[in-house]
Curated annotation (Swiss-Prot):
This is Phospho-N-acetylmuramoyl-pentapeptide-transferase homolog. GO terms for cellular component: membrane. CDD domains: GT_MraY. Pfam families: Glycos_transf_4 (PF00953). It is found in: Membrane. Its main location: membrane. It comes from Arabidopsis thaliana. Predominantly expressed in flowers and siliques (tapetum and ovule inner integument), but also found in roots, stems and leaves.
């Protein structure tokens, strides 16, 4: 391959060009490269260099370190391409500020981020959710035994998904310009692929859209939907406080764990007492009932129902938060959980089904911006809000068991943290030295240390969550 320096008009700069002539570009002088005597403006790679570039094995799920260069992303770069008239295998970007030789060519940052992971995972998730909701729309009237509008569940899902997708192209650059960036914490040995300047607080734009669409598509004001929306906003406010303190405090620490748990428990307790006094629509004629599969049937919990409600509010918020460690993991799992709950509560409260479908669409729309190589993260503003919304749906309908099943992956993530802490404390007390079961926690980071790539982990989580969501939806339908 013959490589020649480009003309000044071919240079690609990410910042105003600080170079005014070709003479300011450092010469490429190294013993591994041979300059042709007949062409002073071109050079040829030697055999060792070509062998080094041609022998690299690349897989679709491999991490690309070029895409997340942590140096000065505004440094000027220029490209070396093949000779005119030839097709190039790709351009090499040379950083003329930090490097003076072509010996370190493979270590230079590229001019722009190249998405090497296709949309296959997200398209598969969209196909699964769409087919499931369309199937339920065709049989919804048989389940509810009442006439329902066409596309009863599909309409809120696609409406929220489209609106959130479009809103992301406005709010993500705005968050980036306002420097609402996720603080970097080195808490473990796992190198995170997110670049240091990724915007956070994505929940500020996708959670309100999901809530507003759910309320707007309910022609009659539903007290269950309004209560679930209020709980969602309350948990989003807790997450917003935590994110704000993390961004603007000196040590980048948000709310302490105790204060955050107290606030979540307070919201859950208030919601439980509201349930006791509110007149909810129920096919059973009474409240505080938990539908379970036969032979258990309906179980009346009485005052224990209030404690169970508070427990689920605290648990679900932290379960979703625990899964928000990989790009697309929390958003995809939450979307599957919302669809499962939308189907499970359909015989009890069809208005809540619209709320669940709308929130699922909002999660999927956000997922298009939060997929692998994410451009934004939901932050605690989004993760706590999603957990609060799921808990509110379960509390208003009594579908705690289907929610537990559908959130099985999140339960596994949180359980790994609890098991690790308990085992470490016990072994340290008994043997004087603490031991660990997992290499690190949560469990998805343990898998990364064992060699699994991030997209593969997320794909596995989606498949498992899909199966669990189908099981949860079926159990909810046969229990109601």
């Amino acid at each position: 391959m013959r490589c020649s320096l480009l003309t000044p008009t071919s240079y690609r700069f990410h910042y105003p060009n600080p170079f005014r002539s070709l003479e300011s570009i450092p010469p490429l002088s190294n013993s591994r490269y041979r300059i042709e005597s007949g062409s002073p403006s071109s050079f040829k790679f030697s055999a060792p260099s070509l062998q080094r570039h041609s022998s690299v094995s690349v897989k679709a799920f491999d991490d690309d370190t070029f895409d997340f260069y942590t140096g000065d992303i505004f440094a000027a770069t220029y490209a070396i391409s093949s000779s005119e008239g030839e097709e190039s295998d790709g351009d090499y970007a040379l950083n003329v500020v930090t490097e003076t030789t072509a010996q370190k060519l493979g270590k230079f940052p590229r001019g722009r981020k190249k998405h090497r992971i296709r949309y296959g995972i997200n398209l598969g998730l969209l196909a699964f959710l769409s087919l499931l909701l369309l199937l339920m729309d065709s049989f919804a009237w048989k389940i509810v035994r009442l006439p329902l509008p066409p596309y009863f569940l599909s309409m809120p899902f696609f409406t929220s998904a489209i609106l959130v997708t479009l809103a992301g192209y406005i709010f993500v650059p705005l968050l980036d310009r306002l420097r609402v960036h996720e603080p970097i914490r080195t808490l473990g040995p796992v190198p995170h692929n997110r670049r240091p300047t990724i915007p956070t607080m994505g929940g500020l734009f996708f959670v309100p859209i999901g809530v507003v669409v759910a309320i707007a598509l309910n022609k009659v004001s539903s007290i269950e939907v309004l209560g679930a929306a209020a709980a969602t906003v309350a948990f989003a406010a807790i997450g917003l406080i935590d994110d704000s303190l993390s961004l603007y405090s000196e040590n980048n620490n948000g709310l302490s764990a105790k204060i955050q748990l107290l606030l979540e428990a307070a919201v859950g307790t208030c919601f439980a007492f509201w349930l006791e006094t509110a007149s909810l629509s129920s096919p059973y004629g009474m409240k505080m009932l938990v539908p379970l599969p036969s032979p258990l049937g309906l179980v009346f919990l009485g005052k224990l129902y209030l404690l169970l409600t508070s427990f689920y509010f605290v648990s679900m918020g932290n379960l979703v938060k625990a899964t928000d460690g990989l790009d697309g993991l929390a958003g995809g799992i939450a979307a599957l959980c919302f669809v499962a709950m939308a189907i499970a509560v359909l015989p009890i409260c069809s208005d809540l089904s619209v709320f669940g479908a709308s929130m699922a669409g909002a999660c999927f729309g956000f997922l298009l911006h939060n997929r692998y190589r994410a451009s934004v993260s939901m932050g605690d503003t989004g993760s706590l809000a999603l957990g609060g919304a799921l808990a509110a749906m379960a509390a208003c309908s009594g579908m705690f068991f289907p929610l537990f099943i559908s959130s099985g992956v999140a339960v596994l993530e949180a359980s790994s943290v609890i098991i690790q802490v308990v085992y470490y404390s016990t072994t340290k007390r008994l043997k004087g030295k603490g031991r660990r079961i997992f290499k690190t926690i949560p469990f998805h980071h343990h898998l990364r240390l064992n060699g699994l790539k991030e997209p593969m982990i997320v794909t596995m989580a989606y498949v498992i969550s899909s199966l669990l969501s189908l099981s949860a939806a079926y159990i909810g339908l046969i229990s109601a």
